[in-house]
């Protein structure tokens, strides 16, 4: 069965219940949340996340697997600022606790940026951070995200992610989140040779570690190292390639999460997810979908 959903908001008093309601309104059977704003460390206590009602609503609507995304501000690849590194370590620990409390198994993490020290130094720092964070008894896997390679990001090559995984002691607690936009922007030809890219991933990392897919089109050409998401079918990856990935027989069990941009003028922009999910379920591109989203 196809597991497809999107990023949804966990906010207000309903929190997880609100997130589940939003996902259901899009026709989703999985979803991804941040436990608070992605750009800061302000978080409500676990008891205010409305977990029981949220889980009950999920069960009622056949949602059994969800994903949590760690905030962008975590950077355990920072070799120059000890405070940034230690904040990343402590906050990642608390995010694991929150993810476990919510009942999710995958916590997506941007591996980190080396801020000028070089990829090797960044990778060593990320390994150090993950070794500090991970415990043998945690239920959650940290899903390292494939990155576009903009700025000083680590993790845009499969070899870099493999090196991180190999360096972590309890690496059974690590998985990978494959982002289509990022991987395309990093230079992998997922448009014309997705099977070849998947084989390369399997050879270098292992397909058994691929636990989350971020399904995004890209505003930029392959190898641009930009990381700007586009709506499904309107970018350089295109509908056919993304549809092929979403329905790939080797990836049917993996939750697919859309993180595409809202459509329309900023103040009144509308989420595209209901329409994009429907297109991908039907395996049929609608060139007029953006007009329908803003109607």
Swiss-Prot record:
* EC number, as in UniProt: 3.1.21.2
What biological-process terms (Gene Ontology) are attached? Answer: base-excision repair
The keyword Ribosomal protein belongs to this UniProt entry's keyword annotation: no
Q: Which CDD domains match?
A: AP2Ec
Which residues are listed for Zn(2+) 3 binding in this entry? 182, 227, 229
Q: What GO molecular function annotation could you give as one example from this UniProt entry? A: phosphoric diester hydrolase activity
Q: How is the cofactor bound?
A: Binds 3 Zn(2+) ions.
Domain of life assignment: Bacteria
Root EC class: hydrolase
Q: Which SUPFAM superfamilies match?
A: Xylose isomerase-like
Check the record and name the NCBIfam families matching this protein: nfo, PRK01060.1-1
Q: What is this protein called?
A: Probable endonuclease 4
Gene from which the chain derives: nfo
